Amino acid sequence: MNTDINNYIVRNNQIEWQPLIEKGIHYQGISVISLRFDGAKQRSTTIMLKFEPGATYPYHNHPGGEEIFVLKGEAILENVTLSQGDYLYTPVNFKHSVTTQKGCIMLFVVPEEVEILKTNKLFTNEKN
């Protein structure tokens, strides 16, 4: 293990927002910064997402759960508004979508790859 702490720091001046593209899908109005890349899993497990006003991430499942901390703005998950400073932990196999009216920046810890679910529902309590 490398014991130089500098190898584990992500400096603000070293990173830029990139469009969120997963499996060839470009999510309009959502940008990402990777904070921790897991080489064994070949994916980022700690990220920041920036949602422009009106942006939506589709209904999906979290096989490994998820942690969210709202850094700025407001996000809506399952018809519940999370605001700056709010924290959410979702258990294994929790399903939801994310949208925002005002825009937001959130910190995510996502141990396993999400699974996009084919549905017309934006929230689980809506009917098809």
Task: Set out the residue ranges of the language-model regions.
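Short histidine-centered beta-strand/loop micro-motifs
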Residues: I47-L49, P58-H62, N79-V80, V98-T100
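Short beta-strand/loop turn elements enriched in aromatics
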Residues: F37, F51-H62, E112-E113
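Ligand-binding loop in jelly-roll beta-barrel domains
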Residues: I30, V92-N120
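Glycine- and acidic-residue-biased ligand/ion/polar-headgroup-sensing regions
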Residues: E52-A55, H62-L77
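Short acidic-glycine-tyrosine-enriched beta hairpin
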Residues: L77-H96
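A short, N-terminal "cap"/entry segment at the start of jelly-roll beta-barrel domains
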Residues: M1-R43, F123-N128
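Conserved hydrophobic/aromatic beta-strand scaffold that supports enzyme active sites
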Residues: V32-S34, T46-K50, E67, Y87-Y89
